Design a protein with these regions (language model features):
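Polybasic, lysine-rich low-complexity intrinsically disordered segments
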Residues: 5-6, 29-32
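Local cysteine-cluster metal-coordination motifs and their immediate loop/turn environment
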Residues: 56-67
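Conserved non-cysteine loop/helix-boundary elements of the Radical SAM core domain that shape
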Residues: 69-93, 97-201
């Protein structure tokens, strides 16, 4: 649970542990790679490279969520800088394999400004082969989505939003400790569509 006294070192450790996931590998291939080496995974036709970045910050903790998060928003700038450095440090990890997807999850990535998220996406473009990049996703809370924020996010190259609506029933949202209500969720979807987002989940 969020705790203002949480050791920042725990935050960084969790962040770096989760920063990269390679998705799209069949279980059999993944097991083979674990027992041999990761090159076995890269040299299979079913391999797809994706980068996941975990933004661990939340304003509050939802009752159902077991993902790592904290409310130390004062650490956001330092953590984002560390993520950018980590992306560069792992430049050789994919061995030149083109990145197909980028997913920024959390936590609550929509607590970041579009320029902050754009800087991370830009670092990926600088460091990795993005010639095959098809999808850049950012998770967002409905109450964070304004017209200006969404328009700026489109400019940064984000083409998919995962909006954490969870329910359109206010009673359920209160029970889950969500910060928005059903009307805010409907408004957020409309704002995203007007900003040009066609891929919404």
């Amino acid at each position: 649970r969020p705790d203002e006294k949480k050791d920042p070192g725990d935050l960084y450790m969790s962040l770096f542990f989760h920063i990269f996931v390679i998705i799209g590998i069949r279980a059999e291939t993944a097991r083979k790679g674990m027992h041999n080496n990761r090159t076995d995974c890269f040299n299979t036709p079913d391999f797809m490279a994706g980068i996941y970045i975990h933004i661990p910050f939340c304003k509050s903790k939802c009752h159902y969520c077991d993902f790592y998060s904290c409310t130390l928003l004062a650490k956001k700038e330092a953590v984002l800088a560390a993520v950018a450095d980590e992306l560069a440090c792992r430049a050789g990890f994919l061995q030149g394999e083109p990145v197909r997807t980028v997913y920024v999850g959390g936590g609550t990535p929509s607590l970041c400004t579009p320029s902050e998220l754009g800087a991370l996406i830009g670092r990926i473009r600088d460091v990795y082969d993005v010639s095959g990049l098809q999808e850049v996703t950012v998770e967002a809370n409905p109450d964070d989505l304004t017209a200006d924020w969404l328009t700026a996010l489109r400019v940064e190259g984000v083409n998919r939003l995962s909006i954490g609506i969870q329910s359109f029933i206010d009673r359920d949202l209160r029970w889950m400790h969500r910060r928005h209500d059903a009307a805010s969720a409907v408004r957020a979807v409309g704002e995203a569509q007007r900003a040009g987002f066609e891929n919404l989940t």
